[in-house]
From Swiss-Prot:
<dbReference type="GO" id="GO:0006422">
    <property type="term" value="P:aspartyl-tRNA aminoacylation"/>
</dbReference>
<dbReference type="InterPro" id="IPR004115">
    <property type="entry name" value="GAD-like_sf"/>
</dbReference>
<dbReference type="Pfam" id="PF00152">
    <property type="entry name" value="tRNA-synt_2"/>
</dbReference>
<dbReference type="GO" id="GO:0016740">
    <property type="term" value="F:transferase activity"/>
</dbReference>
<dbReference type="InterPro" id="IPR045864">
    <property type="entry name" value="aa-tRNA-synth_II/BPL/LPL"/>
</dbReference>
<feature type="binding site">
    <location>
        <position position="174"/>
    </location>
    <ligand>
        <name>L-aspartate</name>
    </ligand>
</feature>
<feature type="binding site">
    <location>
        <position position="443"/>
    </location>
    <ligand>
        <name>L-aspartate</name>
    </ligand>
</feature>
<dbReference type="InterPro" id="IPR004364">
    <property type="entry name" value="Aa-tRNA-synt_II"/>
</dbReference>
<dbReference type="InterPro" id="IPR002312">
    <property type="entry name" value="Asp/Asn-tRNA-synth_IIb"/>
</dbReference>
<dbReference type="InterPro" id="IPR029351">
    <property type="entry name" value="GAD_dom"/>
</dbReference>
<dbReference type="InterPro" id="IPR004365">
    <property type="entry name" value="NA-bd_OB_tRNA"/>
</dbReference>
<dbReference type="GO" id="GO:0005737">
    <property type="term" value="C:cytoplasm"/>
</dbReference>
<comment type="subunit">
    <text>Homodimer.</text>
</comment>
<dbReference type="InterPro" id="IPR004524">
    <property type="entry name" value="Asp-tRNA-ligase_1"/>
</dbReference>
<keyword id="KW-0648">Protein biosynthesis</keyword>
<dbReference type="GO" id="GO:0003676">
    <property type="term" value="F:nucleic acid binding"/>
</dbReference>
<comment type="function">
    <text>Catalyzes the attachment of L-aspartate to tRNA(Asp) in a two-step reaction: L-aspartate is first activated by ATP to form Asp-AMP and then transferred to the acceptor end of tRNA(Asp).</text>
</comment>
């Protein structure tokens, strides 16, 4: 029979109606001769009642055979429950079953289909189709669908054009490692899966599309963590003839629309703006979490005269004050934080506690001469804990920024109901890579430098500033964008500053440089990480929770066993040969 409605949508208004439902058996209970079944579908749970006095022996026998995750079809009359269940939207009603058909049986599942399960991540991914039956996973993916629907409607209203760009593109040396695809037709040549549609969307501006968008898969072969996947989705925008502010206004409107339509939250516009240098100085991060205080304090000048060379001779000394937390952290706890500090390049972590108005701790004796000045500078009160890092400015900022976030989580200082958006602007154009031994693009090599610093492309690259902007939410980079270079000579200067020879630039980006000979308009854009945005809206801590079929931290899929080996014939067709792993050679 045709399904009348979803099980999770039956309400009191349907009492007295005969309906047909289809779904999965959640659980079965036998009470006083009656059989109660929780029928589950994507919209929720409906209680079924099978009364032996009102159904045939065949229906009763079928009901007794039901097990969890059997797929069934039931017909019956909606009735009011004697005792309502306020925890369920369907809790005021039940279905008195008159007909029951088993559409399919099921083996015992490797974990219960319910929220809050304790199965490990790989088991969940191995049986992802079962994991996705759980209500919280269904809700996460329904939220994702609502977000993309809201985004499309908003951009369509602003006359953006949805254009698909190629997945088989050219490998470029900047950024993360590419996923490479060998060409069978052009032996020895490789495509790359795009890390973003950056160049193709710029070329669409040269083609006169004016406003482009795409919700698009991108690929990066990089080490994974909770908010990264090898394949991810971004909301990609590009516009012609707009200023930095106009692009940000459009982005803020998009986010405001999504927040209102999916969370019922009215966000305050415009978003705050923070310079990159201020973000690093005050928060120790280029993606500051502004939901709590504990700002970094610069004490370099304050401690210059102390008889403690670690402080007095350090390039920078910075600190954070953990208010009222002296009793929360033992020496053992601080030792653990010291190990964290070392992971960020710090040589150690100094600390004092304020106890009865005096400084206590390993370095307190060196600070007695400046206690009053230190107390004033840091606004110290009894029971405060102060953590110091003496190192380069970059190391001090990064270390204390990491500790700031860790401590805030441990002490419950973060209001998880807050959504604090802000723009980080005035970025450096380049960042030094110790691994590469040279300056690299902080964003990408197509970013427009600020006019007043562009002359440093042939001088001190550390002084070049970009017309770039990142949108940050609760300590996560939600997205980033910039105005782009549209003048050929400036683009060539940029490539040269990055160490490209003329030949290398033409080999890698000759098509883009050629396009700049044909009236390339001023343009700029932005990309928002959809997975990360939905993760934050859903209150999750890992983007796997908002992606239907993600990879694990080893970039593998436990369900399909991807990536896998392939037949020798397939490799031969591609003129490829796989070298045996050294560990296998010795076994």
């Amino acid at each position: 029979m045709k399904r009348s409605m979803y099980a999770g949508r039956v309400r009191e208004e349907h009492i007295g109606q005969e309906i047909t439902l289809k779904g999965w058996v959640g659980r079965r209970r036998d009470l006083g001769g009656l059989i109660f079944i929780d029928l589950r579908d994507r919209e929720g749970i409906m209680q079924l009642v099978i009364n032996p006095e009102k159904v045939s022996a065949e229906v009763m026998a079928t009901a007794e055979s039901l097990r969890s995750e059997f797929v069934i079809e039931v017909t019956g009359q909606v009735a009011a429950r004697e005792q309502a269940n306020d925890k369920l939207p369907t809790g005021a009603v039940e279905l008195n079953v008159t007909a029951l058909i088993v559409l399919n049986t099921a083996k015992t599942t490797p974990f219960e289909i319910k929220d809050g399960i304790e199965a490990n991540d790989d088991t969940r991914l191995r049986y992802r189709y079962l994991d996705l039956r759980r209500p919280e996973m269904l809700e996460n993916l329904k939220l994702r669908a609502k977000v993309t629907h809201s985004i499309r409607n908003y951009l369509d209203e602003l006359e953006f054009i949805d254009v698909e760009t190629p997945f088989l593109s050219k490998s470029t040396p900047e950024g993360a490692r590419d996923y490479l695809v060998p060409s069978r037709v052009n032996k020895g040549h490789f495509y790359a899966l795009p890390q973003s549609p950056q160049i193709t969307k710029q070329l669409l501006m040269n083609a006169g599309f004016d406003r482009y968008y795409q919700i698009v898969k991108c690929f990066r072969d990089e080490d994974l963590r909770g908010d990264r996947q090898p394949e991810f989705t971004q909301v990609d925008l590009e516009t012609s003839f707009l200023t930095e502010q106009e692009i940000q206004d459009i982005t803020e409107g998009l986010i405001a629309r999504v927040m209102k339509e999916t969370k019922g939250i009215e966000v305050t516009l415009p978003f705050p703006r923070m310079k990159y240098d201020d973000a690093m100085a005050l928060y120790g991060s280029d993606k500051p979490d502004t939901r709590f205080d504990m700002l970094l304090q610069d004490l370099t000048e304050v401690v210059k005269g102390v008889d403690f060379k670690v402080f007095s001779e350090a390039p920078a000394v910075k600190a954070i004050v953990v208010k009222g937390a002296a009793d929360n952290y033992s020496r053992k706890d601080i030792d653990k934080m010291t190990e964290v500090a070392k992971q960020y390049g710090a040589k150690g972590l100094a600390w004092v506690k304020v106890v009865d108005g005096e400084l206590n701790g390993p370095v307190a004796k060196f600070l007695t001469g400046i206690q009053e000045e230190l107390t004033t500078a840091l606004a110290l009160e009894d029971k405060d804990l102060v953590l110091f890092v003496a190192d380069t400015l970059e190391v001090a900022n990064a270390t204390l920024g990491a500790l700031r976030g860790r401590i805030a989580k441990e002490l419950g200082l973060i209001d998880n109901d807050k959504f604090n958006f802000l723009w980080v602007v005035d970025w450096p154009m380049f960042e030094w890579s110790e691994e590469e031994g040279r300056y690299m693009s902080a964003h990408h090599p197509f970013t427009l430098p600020q006019e007043e610093t562009a002359h440093e492309l042939e001088g001190d690259l550390a002084k070049v500033r970009a017309i770039a902007y990142d949108i940050v939410l609760n300590g996560y980079e939600l997205g980033g964008g910039s105005l782009r270079i549209n003048q050929k000579d400036l683009q060539e200067r940029m490539f040269k500053a990055l160490g490209f020879s003329t030949e290398e630039a033409n080999d890698q980006f000759g098509f883009l440089l050629e396009a700049m000979d044909y009236g390339f308009p001023p343009h700029g854009g932005l990309a928002i990480g959809l997975d990360r945005f939905v993760m934050l809206l859903a209150g999750e801590e890992n983007i796997r929770e908002v992606i239907a079929f993600p990879k694990n931290n080893k970039a593998t899929d436990p369900m399909t066993q991807a990536p896998s080996t392939v037949a020798l014939k397939q490799l031969e067709e591609l003129s490829l040969q796989v070298e045996e792993d050294e560990t296998n050679k010795t076994n």
